[in-house]
Amino acid sequence: MFSAIARKLFGSRNDRYLRSLQPLVDRINGLEAEYEALSDSELTAMTYAFKARLEKGETLDDLLPEAFAVVREGSKRVLGMRHYDVQLIGGIVLHQGKISEMKTGEGKTLVATLSLYLNALSGKGAHLVTVNDYLARRDAEWMGKLYQFLGLSVGVIIHGIEDQQRKAAYNADITYGTNNEFGFDYLRDNMKFSLEEMVQRPLNYAIVDEVDSILVDEARTPLIISGPTEDSTDKYYKVDRLIPQLEKERHYTLDEKQRSVTFTEEGNEQIEQLMRQAGLLRDGDLYDLHNIEMVHHVNQALKAHAMFEVDRDYIVKDGQVVIIDEFTGRMMPGRRYSDGLHQALEAKEQVVIQNESQTLASITFQNLFRLYNKLAGMTGTADTEAAEFQSIYNLEVVIIPTNRDMVRIDRDDMVFRTLEEKLKAVAEDIKVSYEKGQPVLVGTVSIEKSEMVSHFLKKLKIPHEILNAKHHEREAEIVAQAGRPRAVTIATNMAGRGTDIQLGGNLEMRLKKEIDPEASPAERTQQEIQIRTEYEQDKALVLASGGLHIIGTERHESRRIDNQLRGRAGRQGDPGSSGFYLSLQDDLMRIFGSERMDGMLKKLGLQDGEAIVHPWINKAVESAQKKVEGRNFDIRKNLLKFDDVMNEQRKVIYDQRKELMENEDIRDFIDEIREEVVHALVDSHLGEDVYPEEWDAKGFREAMLNQFNLDLNVESWKHEEGVTHLVAKERAMAAVKAYSEAREARLGPPLMRYLEKSIMLQVLDTLWKEHLLNMDHLKEGIHLRGYAQKDPLNEYKREAFQLFSMLLQRIREEAIEFLGKVEVQQPEEVAAYEAELAEARNQQMSLNHPESGSWGGEGEGPSSEGAPHLPFKRDGEKVGRNQACPCGSGKKYKQCCGKLS
């Protein structure tokens, strides 16, 4: 109550922050007349003047008013668009590393130019991250004219371009690209063998467009680069035939809230029996150690049948299972679910199974974007997730006021008892709008539901366009013309974000498409006049009919997705309306207490085809959505705690790789490792507290032969006077040193340096790949520790640290072993072998952005609180060798993760 009174007196935090920016906006406006008087060349010269001032010690904040004024003036001249005051505020928010929430149609693309220009002046690069290639290319071409006019270079990163083009794009002052491409380039760079091959510069500043989609919706989906494994595909078909013989509830239970499926006790017995009959089980039970691989196959097959539906989660196209993006409804060709789930779906649909893949490198979007020195975001819908952005990413959400007041009419939800009643009402609503010339956009949650709406419209003979994963080729065109009179567009999960729906249609697109390029100039002019006249008439008709009408056919789990759909109407003060039609058979209503509501509606005497409309219903639905959002937030928070463990290890390995590539001569490093390995072998076989007569001389001799290719007569040492543990160490080291020097003399120092570096990198990559597989296995079963009253997160941290310590030890041992045994005649052989390795790896690599696995079981077992999360702004300090290791082991850095360094 007191907080509400305080807000009335002093305004909200958002209001106070916006007021604090007004003096900056006034300073920018005050420069407008001065910059209008400049010639084009004088305006361009301002960029070079700003760069010179930065070099002399001024900061970007010092330059902000002048830089923004220059961009505004440049935009007026090149694009014919002037930044409004609210857009200047949006630009300041982005520069300060916050999230700018701007409603649809308020010009986010133009807003980004302000802070991108300012931050690019440092020469360290500025990235604009979008959700698809179309938007990246469109915005880079469109806004690129402005940057180039002001003397800055622009690059674009899209799928399928070569490394040379990528490097040039990253070296540009401003780079546009998709979240996936930025992530995969980061991973690929950390698999390269030389610094020259790497395409990215250090990550400096990024603006993430549709930041809610990338940092919230896709937070549980890691980017994975994988290669093929040797696993047989026959097992998937054989196991798949058994699953239809199981009964739901009796043999397995499906928890839709937790998105998990588990066998009952009877189900475990039944599947074991079926597998024995099919000859798939070796001796013993399904859960015996030697059958553990089959558990993986059975679990994925059950998940494929019970949790995944064709035309909702995936479609079968050209004999392949193609994932459908849950949030956009788009197809994701080339993307595959990991851990054998995609193979299980292929077996279920009886298409050719592609080999299961093994992870070579992976990263989540949270950890990718935390690598930037400064991060900002923009979206039309972030406020509902403001708490999550603040607590996980330390990103504050600032709501930017609209340039014109919103006049859209949002109706209360209408709730029907059955799906059929609801769809009939939707079709009737569309018919009313269609007859008065009003354009309608219908939002559905799946391909199946969009086909059902289409079926009802066909009965009423209403022409319409369908936009979903099956009809994605014309996406931009369909969305752009969805504002024409009588246009009816059915869209799954509002594909087409980023493309404005303009009332009357998109004039530019019509001119480009309908004017005949082969006609005479006079005819083309006549055609243009006719199209412009039609456009003005269409726009007037749509405005008179009430603007764009939005119909939601179901509430999404997230209020934000619903708000995105609503936000397509009422852009820039245009009229518009929206309403949601619900039924008790909808997923959200069914999962969250529809039985109780069904009984209540029957008591109220609700007849077939009647709907209940009341603000209380809206509140009940919103309450259900908040529950889901809260649960999903907890899952994402828990996932991030688990992923942070992996992230620390990844940073250590990637930093180590880069250090190896930066140094031409790693001889001292190799000598240090050799000494460590020799000392460890002596300590293990010729103990300090053991008499020489009791030494394991035979074991030590074999170990030295295996590790260094050296045959030492250790037996004779035992009988020599005065030979101690320390003397044995010195002798072994002297022998190793002499052998290494002899090899170097034979091969020559340049080749030896090349070999040391090359072998070190190859061993590190091979063992890191194995380590990722071990970490995947650890992750899969860790949540079960909760049933033994152990904290899964602490157990994961402890065992992950043990695995990582073993990895570092193995890297040292195997690198030294290879160096001792490898034989090379010519330097060209090494270079040829490396090139062959890189080529083979590139051909076999596949890029995946799957549904993430269950880090810690997605809430199963007790949850655990970890250390607070780091904000997205880094101080960039390097860990000192004598400081505590950041992985939390309690050891010094040089004795733990820094051991390789």
Curated annotation (Swiss-Prot):
The keyword Cell membrane applies. Keywords: ATP-binding, Cell inner membrane, Cell membrane, Cytoplasm, Membrane, Metal-binding, Nucleotide-binding, Protein transport, Translocase, Translocation, Transport, Zinc. It catalyses: ATP + H2O + cellular proteinSide 1 = ADP + phosphate + cellular proteinSide 2. Residues 847-901 are annotated as: Disordered. GO terms for cellular component: cell envelope Sec protein transport complex; cytosol; plasma membrane. The keyword Hydrolase does not apply. Its cofactor is Zn(2+). Its main location: membrane. Its EC number is 7.4.2.8. It is a peripheral membrane protein. GO terms for biological process: intracellular protein transmembrane transport; protein import; protein targeting; protein transport by the Sec complex. May bind 1 zinc ion per subunit. One of its GO terms (molecular function) is ATP binding. Zn(2+) binds at C885, C887, C896, C897. It is found in: Cell inner membrane; Cytoplasm. ATP binds at Q87, G105, E106, G107, K108, T109, D500. Pfam families: P-loop_SecA, SEC-C, SecA_DEAD, SecA_PP_bind, SecA_SW. NCBIfam families: PRK12904.1, secA. Part of the Sec protein translocase complex. Interacts with the SecYEG preprotein conducting channel. Has a central role in coupling the hydrolysis of ATP to the transfer of proteins into and across the cell membrane, serving both as a receptor for the preprotein-SecB complex and as an ATP-driven molecular motor driving the stepwise translocation of polypeptide chains across the membrane. Belongs to the SecA family. PANTHER family: CHLOROPLAST PROTEIN-TRANSPORTING ATPASE, SECA INNER MEMBRANE COMPONENT OF SEC PROTEIN SECRETION SYSTEM. Monomer and homodimer. Part of the essential Sec protein translocation apparatus which comprises SecA, SecYEG and auxiliary proteins SecDF-YajC and YidC. This is Protein translocase subunit SecA 1. It comes from Magnetococcus marinus (strain ATCC BAA-1437 / JCM 17883 / MC-1).
